[in-house]
């Protein structure tokens, strides 16, 4: 199957997966799905925070190494991101809760797993070229949003917490939503020298999950405006990742564009 047909098919499959139902050992009415998801995320958001400093430091080291050594360590970066997505898929979306027993948020677990597998395939057949050439100034708009996601200044009650220590201990690196913006942003900064299937699948899943979080502000008890604001990096950068082929073609010479891979 050629690329022009394969990519839309993959995106449609991902969209279908995002609407899979949540499963729990204790049956529940579908109208309570948001409460079930809330129970899972409350538990999983704290379960692996002990790993956060390690992943924060590893990410910074990787970014410095990418800037210095570029595509020489491209496969290391691809593997790191792929492992993170597979980790998020299972660690963030499976929990044994007090109210519902073993619970699986399949609508997130399946598509994020697929994204992770695409990243692992990128390790095997790499197409991302981490060259970081000089870009027009407007293309760096993602950086403040990446910093916000990396910091994730929020406390357990979902209120603002601008403690600088969170630059080392926030949920970045152990939760999907604050970590994905950085990964997509990196791809946009090396575009067009990217694996387009990886960029599109990662961006689509990020955008849909980000938009579902927007809906949670209206239907999930305890979901705060600040938590919604902290999901704007995921929404904006994911949307940009999908639209960048349209936006950038108008701003760079056509001969510099790579074909889809």
Task: List the model feature ranges, each with a label.
Residues 10-22, 79-91, 107-125, 134-159, ...:
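Alpha-helical transmembrane segments of multi-pass integral membrane proteins
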Residues 98-110, 132-135, 163-173, 223-233:
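Non-cytosolic membrane-interface motifs at loop->transmembrane helix junctions
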Residues 10-21, 49-64, 110-126, 176-190, ...:
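Hydrophobic cores of alpha-helical transmembrane segments in multi-pass inner/ER membrane proteins
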Residues 25-29, 90-100, 152-164, 213-223:
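Juxtamembrane "helix-exit" motif on the non-cytosolic side of transmembrane helices
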Residues 38-51, 163-180:
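Short aromatic-rich membrane-water interface segments that cap or initiate transmembrane helices
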Residues 1-3, 32-34, 62-73, 123-136, ...:
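Juxtamembrane membrane-water interface segments of multi-pass membrane proteins
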Residues 19, 180-261:
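C-terminal transmembrane-bundle signature of multipass membrane proteins
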Residues 1-101:
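N-terminal topogenic module of multi-pass integral membrane proteins
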């Amino acid at each position: 199957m050629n690329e022009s047909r394969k990519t839309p098919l993959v995106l449609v499959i991902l969209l279908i997966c995002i609407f899979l139902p949540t499963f729990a050992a204790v049956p529940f009415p579908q109208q309570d799905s948001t409460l079930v998801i809330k129970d899972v995320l409350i538990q999983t958001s704290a379960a692996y925070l002990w790993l956060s400093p390690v992943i924060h430091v590893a990410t910074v080291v990787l970014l410095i190494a990418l800037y210095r050594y570029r595509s020489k360590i491209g496969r290391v970066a691809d593997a790191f991101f792929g492992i993170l997505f597979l980790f998020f898929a299972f660690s963030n979306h499976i929990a044994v809760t007090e109210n519902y027993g073993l619970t699986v948020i399949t609508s997130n677990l399946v598509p994020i797993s697929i994204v992770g597998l695409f990243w692992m395939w990128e390790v095997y057949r790499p197409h991302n070229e981490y060259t970081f050439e000089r870009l027009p100034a407007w293309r760096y708009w993602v950086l403040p949003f990446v910093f916000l996601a990396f910091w994730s200044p929020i406390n357990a009650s979902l209120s603002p917490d601008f403690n600088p220590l969170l630059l080392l201990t926030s949920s970045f690196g152990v939760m999907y939503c604050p970590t994905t913006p950085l990964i997509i942003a990196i791809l946009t900064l090396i575009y067009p020298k990217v694996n387009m299937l990886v960029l599109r699948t990662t961006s689509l899943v990020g955008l849909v999950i980000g938009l579902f979080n927007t809906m949670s502000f209206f239907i999930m008890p305890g979901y705060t405006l600040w938590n919604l604001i902290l999901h704007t990096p995921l929404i904006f950068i994911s949307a940009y990742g999908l639209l960048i082929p349209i936006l950038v073609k108008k701003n760079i010479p056509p001969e510099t564009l790579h074909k889809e891979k």
